[in-house]
Amino acid sequence: MECVKQLCRNHLRLDNLTDPVRSVLTKGTTAEKVQLAACCLGVVCSIICLALGIAAAAVGVSCGGFALGLGIIAILLGIVLFATSALDVLENHGLVGCPFKLPCKSSPANEPAVQFFKGKNGSADQVILVTQ
């Protein structure tokens, strides 16, 4: 339980979110500022569209269930894409992601290297294949 409390203290602070946003606004490039603003606007618009879609379905507007389901999936996908794009900008400015990230990159394959050792007259005297 102490581990969970420590994790919450270290990673769930408001400063962990506000500091990267402040960094983007003060030190970020124009492209990063535009991307962050567009992402925030996209998330807000997607949430509004989702709420309107649910309200329309509740009222009983003539909309097929399949079309409504596809619309909700598309809007949720939009929220996820906008949010991940915003997080991408913020991670460049110090936002710490989830502490439980799985390693995405596999270790590089050990490729053999060839080393040439020259002899006295400049010809290849010895060739060694080195694996790491």
UniProtKB/Swiss-Prot annotation:
Keywords: Host membrane, Membrane, Secreted, Transmembrane, Transmembrane helix, Virulence
Keyword Disulfide bond: no
Subcellular location: Secreted; Host vacuole, Host pathogen-containing vacuole, Host pathogen-containing vacuole membrane
Gene Ontology CC: extracellular region; host cell membrane; pathogen-containing vacuole membrane
Entry keyword Zinc: no
A Pfam short name: IncE
Membrane topology reported for the UniProt record: Multi-pass membrane protein
Principal location listed in the UniProt entry: secreted
Transmembrane segments: 41-61, 66-86
Signal peptide bounds: none
Induction: Cotranscribed with incD, incF and incG within 2 hours after internalization.
Function: Inclusion membrane protein probably involved in early modification events of the chlamydial inclusion.
Protein name: Inclusion membrane protein E
Organism of origin: Chlamydia trachomatis serovar L2 (strain ATCC VR-902B / DSM 19102 / 434/Bu)
Lineage: Bacteria, Pseudomonadati, Chlamydiota, Chlamydiia, Chlamydiales
